[in-house]
Design a protein with these regions (language model features):
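Helix-to-loop junction immediately C-terminal to a conserved catalytic motif
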Residues: 49
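Conserved ABC transporter NBD signature motif
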Residues: 57-65, 74
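Q-loop/switch helix immediately C-terminal to the Walker
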Residues: 84, 90-107
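Conserved ABC ATPase "signature" region
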Residues: 110-128
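Conserved ABC ATPase signature
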Residues: 132-136, 140
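Hydrophobic anchor residue at the start of the ABC signature
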Residues: 146-147
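ABC ATPase C-loop
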Residues: 150-151
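Catalytic Walker B motif of ABC-type/P-loop ATPase nucleotide-binding domains
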Residues: 157-161
């Protein structure tokens, strides 16, 4: 799926967060937003996901203008993962069961074995299924959320500081897996490790 922004701006409480931003991502393209702190990286991802609407300009998903009437449809085509990684309460297993019971996800039948197969790629063990989500470290939450992106297999990934706080090996694994994915991916990150892989382009202010 393609993403295109035309002169997008966003202002809140009189403060201009994003101004006249235009760019496009072709299907399967991957780009990193590496702007300084406080310049609207996370806000941009939320605008594309439809959490809020631009003050000015237009956002297109597959050449369709994102608006109130189609935002729910397009959200089902996107996975949004952030550094907070808010997971349902209970054990990780119960949390996964709840997520895959949602109407948008219930078509994914064999999610348990798929998740289990992916755990080793992000250096987690199957013992994590028995942990309570409230006991997980930030890094464990981030890696689980990234696994969810892979299992949900939606055509667009929006990744907000997905490598923040991870060690070098885990960062490298995540970067490699994102680079190898077929999805259209937009990443918000300060991490310079993304520049070490030529699969990614960079969006400037």
């Amino acid at each position: 799926m393609e993403i295109r922004l035309e002169d997008v701006g966003y202002t809140i409480d009189g403060q201009e967060i994003i101004r006249n931003l235009s760019f496009s991502l072709k299907s399967g393209q991957k780009a990193v937003i590496a702007w300084p702190s406080g310049t609207g990286k996370t806000t941009l991802l939320k605008l594309i996901f439809g959490f809020t609407i631009p003050t000015t300009g237009k956002i297109f998903i597959d050449n369709q203008l994102l608006n109130h009437s189609n935002v729910k449809h397009f959200r089902k085509q996107m996975s949004y993962a952030n550094q907070v990684a808010d997971l349902p309460k209970g054990t990780v297993q119960n949390s996964m069961d709840e997520i895959f019971s949602f109407p948008a996800n219930e078509h994914i039948r064999d999610y348990k074995s798929t998740i289990n197969n992916l755990l080793s790629e992000v250096r987690l063990s199957s013992e994590i299924f028995g942990k309570n989500t409230e006991e997980l470290s930030g890094g464990e939450r981030q890696r689980l959320t990234f696994i969810l992106c892979q299992v949900l297999n939606r055509p667009i990934w929006l990744l907000d500081e997905i490598t923040s706080g991870l060690d070098t090996d885990n960062k490298s694994n995540i970067v490699r897996m994102v680079a190898e994915a077929s999805q259209t991916v937009l990443i918000s990150s300060h991490d310079t490790i993304w520049r070490e892989n030529n699969a990614f382009t960079f969006i400037n202010l």
